Amino acid sequence: MTNRIELSGVVAKALVRSQSPSGVKHCHFWLEHRSTMVEADLPRQVFCRLPVVVSGARSEALTQNLVQGSSILVSGFLAYQTSRNGVGKLVLHADKISQI
């Protein structure tokens, strides 16, 4: 099975940093993507807003220069998460971030 995604976009909301009870650092933010893709030989406007999380010791180094409005390229994998209120969503777990 393959689960790998690369998506460019803009940091849509301010970063939120947290730490788990076991001491793992996390950085959460929303990535907003807009592009024009070709589907069935026709141009299609694409828009999505996706939550991103960066975890572990490298989270601060990967996100230290990010602010709301930063244009970035994010690589990682997708995972389904269910919130405390039972609402589920796909989350991009990033392991590489570069500014563009």
UniProtKB/Swiss-Prot annotation:
Keywords: DNA replication, DNA-binding, Primosome. Residues 1-100 form the SSB domain. GO terms for biological process: DNA replication; DNA replication, synthesis of primer. InterPro entries: NA-bd_OB-fold (IPR012340), Primosome_PriB/ssb (IPR000424), Prisomal_replication_PriB (IPR023646). One of its GO terms (molecular function) is enzyme activator activity. One of its GO terms (cellular component) is nucleoid. Pfam families: SSB_1. NCBIfam families: PriB_gamma (TIGR04418). Homodimer. Interacts with PriA and DnaT. Component of the replication restart primosome. Primosome assembly occurs via a 'hand-off' mechanism. PriA binds to replication forks, subsequently PriB then DnaT bind; DnaT then displaces ssDNA to generate the helicase loading substrate. Belongs to the PriB family. Involved in the restart of stalled replication forks, which reloads the replicative helicase on sites other than the origin of replication; the PriA-PriB pathway is the major replication restart pathway. During primosome assembly it facilitates complex formation between PriA and DnaT on DNA; stabilizes PriA on DNA. Stimulates the DNA unwinding activity of PriA helicase. This is Replication restart protein PriB. It comes from Vibrio cholerae serotype O1 (strain ATCC 39315 / El Tor Inaba N16961). The gene is priB.
